[in-house]
Curated annotation (Swiss-Prot):
Binding residues for Mg(2+): S88, D231, D233, D235
Superkingdom assignment: Archaea
Protein's UniProt name: Phosphoglucosamine mutase
Enzyme class: isomerase
Cofactor binding, note field: Binds 1 Mg(2+) ion per subunit.
Gene this protein is translated from: glmM
GO molecular function: magnesium ion binding; phosphoglucosamine mutase activity
GO BP terms in the entry: carbohydrate metabolic process
Organism in which the protein naturally occurs: Methanococcus maripaludis (strain C5 / ATCC BAA-1333)
Length: 447
């Protein structure tokens, strides 16, 4: 049975028996674990089940309660591994399990496959009375994380910030840490509720409408509030500028990459194959290299360690600040957006408006999982003929041009093939998208 996807285990109505087996499998190779959970109603259930498996296999467990993923990832340094019970931005009926190494990086596919093999092949014998693990409760994890982050910040301006936590795990950290950083904070959806009563945890324009309206109302009196909004486990963030605009993920990432290079003198940054070419355009001016990797925080973290770059980010709002820690951190990212504003002495909307605007198009096409490889093989061969270019196959199939690019990639969690296009001219973007869609459909049909 395949359990792990592109971001750990994530399922609708996650079975506690699966959680138990995961815990028992972990105990085969790890004897000291720290575990946390987000606000989902099934969090206690899944945590209890995975803890039972760990204990049965002789693994000692420290529970740190309801915390964001960055707190869990930071805490993992004192243990053999960290276990986060979360389904991130998914609706409340979902839950999941994401595993972290001591250095804060998420488990890679090889590590997950090893666990999967144990789960699928082990007989799950009962532990003996003299080899059962123990449980310890630690209530200092949030405090320790917050103190560490604040020690590494450089913010002198008292910013006005609306913090939207989605009734999720960010509630226990974000409002307080922004306040301690000197901000005047207005909290929205900041009480923990695993039903996500205020909004769904995906921080997109549709879900953030009420928060946008609040910011527009506040700024009608020239108060210059910006917004920071999280997903379900606060490993991501998106910003809302003073004009009440939910910032474009690509533009915010490009602006921040430029800031990192200008402030630190960094000679490279890491991003993914689906990130905007605005990043390349921005950083070429400073002679900095853009290193692209597969989509996903695991790949970004691996490349950061390999290249020594201090920052890596995805255009989903998943950013890793290697100079602080290697876990994706939406709380730290939000605070560093404020650092960027202070560095430039500009409002957020002014910084974002300086980023080049390109034509972006996205489509997803239904495709049975068993046909995905057939489609990608066809796209690679046919695309090379049509575009007269060798395909880039780091993650999916990408063709790059002077004025744009197209990426065709199978979804790792759904029965779709995704087509992403970016171009400097609208006509070229539409032409690329039309060609991409046609290739995918032909690949599905097998003709």
């Amino acid at each position: 049975m395949k359990l792990f996807g592109t971001s750990g285990i994530r399922m609708k109505n996650l079975d506690p028996l699966i959680a138990y087996k995961v815990g028992y499998a972990i105990s085969k190779n790890f004897k000291k674990a720290v575990i946390g959970r987000d606000t989902r109603t099934t969090g206690n259930l899944i945590e209890s089940a995975i803890t039972a498996g760990l204990l049965n296999g002789g693994c000692d467990v420290t529970t740190i309660g309801m915390v964001p993923t960055p707190v869990l990832g930071y805490s993992a340094k004192d243990y053999d591994l960290g276990i986060m019970i979360t389904a991130s931005h998914n609706p409340p009926e979902y839950n999941g399990i994401k595993l972290f190494n001591k250095n804060g990086t998420a488990f890679d596919p090889k590590q997950e496959k090893e666990l999967e093999n144990i789960i699928n092949n082990d007989d799950f014998n009962e532990g003996t009375w003299d080899n059962i693990g123990c449980v310890i409760e630690d209530k200092t994890a949030v405090k320790n994380y917050s103190e560490y982050i604040l020690q590494n910040l450089d913010i002198k301006t008292n910013f006005n910030v609306v913090v939207d936590c989605a009734n999720a795990a960010g509630c226990v950290v974000s409002p307080n840490i922004f306040t301690e950083a000197g901000c005047k904070v207005i909290s929205v959806n900041s009480h923990c509720d695993g039903r996500f009563v205020g909004r769904m945890p995906e921080p997109n324009e549709k879900n953030l409408k009420e928060t946008v309206d609040i910011i527009k109302g506040l700024n009608s009196n020239c108060r210059n509030y910006i917004g920071i909004a999280h997903d379900g486990d606060a490993d991501r963030m998106i910003a809302i500028d003073e004009l009440g605009r939910v910032t474009d993920f690509d533009k915010l990432l490009a602006a921040f990459c430029k800031y990192i290079v200008q402030k630190t003198g960094a000679d490279k940054i890491v991003t993914t194959v689906d990130a905007s070419m605005a990043i390349d355009e921005y950083l070429n001016e400073f002679g900095a290299e853009v290193v692209r990797t597969k989509i996903g925080d695991v790949a970004v973290a691996e490349e950061l360690e390999k290249t020594g770059a201090i920052f890596g980010g995805e255009p989903s709002g998943t950013w890793i600040h290697r100079d602080i820690h290697l876990t994706p951190d939406g709380i730290l990212s939000g605070l560093r957006v404020l650092e960027m504003m202070e560095f430039y002495d500009k409002k957020l909307h002014e910084i974002i408006d300086e980023v080049p605007s390109y034509y972006n198009m996205r489509e997803k096409i239904l495709c049975p999982d068993n046909l995905k490889q057939q489609v990608m093989d066809y796209v690679s061969k046919e695309g090379e003929k049509i575009f007269e270019k060798k395909p880039e196959t780091l993650d999916g199939v990408r063709f790059s041009f002077e004025k744009g690019w197209i990426l065709i990639r199978p979804s790792g969690t759904e029965s779709y093939v995704r087509v992403r296009v970016e171009a400097k001219e609208k006509d070229f973007a539409e032409k690329l998208m039309k060609t991409g869609i046609s290739m995918v459909y032909t690949g599905i049909s097998g003709n």
